[in-house]
């Protein structure tokens, strides 16, 4: 199951209700974690051992779902990343805002 972050929920509501304009990110990036990200943009993303977020592209949504339109491949780990079980989609290659998160 996946969820939108508080940041994205607020941006979409403000955009729909004409109290702010949401600027779509130029690119989105997939990040990984060993536990759930939280709606408030907290959580512990992987670090070190050759880890970095990877850019992803997605097809247009249909019936409330979408999927990545190309493989998202992470570089080989140079040490343990632990048991990766969760993903986050972010609006920047580092830092930035969590948009969507969920478990594998």
Put a short name on every predicted segment.
Residues 1-87, 91-104:
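Small cysteine-rich, disulfide-bonded extracellular modules of the LU/uPAR three-finger superfamily
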């Amino acid at each position: 199951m996946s969820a939108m972050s508080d940041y994205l929920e607020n941006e979409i509501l403000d955009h729909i209700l004409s109290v702010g304009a949401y600027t779509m990110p130029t690119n989105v990036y997939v990040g990984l974690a060993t536990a759930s990200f939280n709606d408030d943009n907290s959580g512990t993303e992987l670090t070190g051992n050759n880890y970095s977020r990877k850019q992803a592209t997605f097809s247009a949504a249909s019936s409330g779902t979408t999927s990545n339109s190309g493989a998202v491949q992470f570089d080989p780990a140079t040490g343990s990343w632990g048991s990766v079980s969760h993903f986050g989609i972010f609006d920047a290659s580092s830092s930035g805002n969590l948009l969507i998160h969920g478990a594998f």
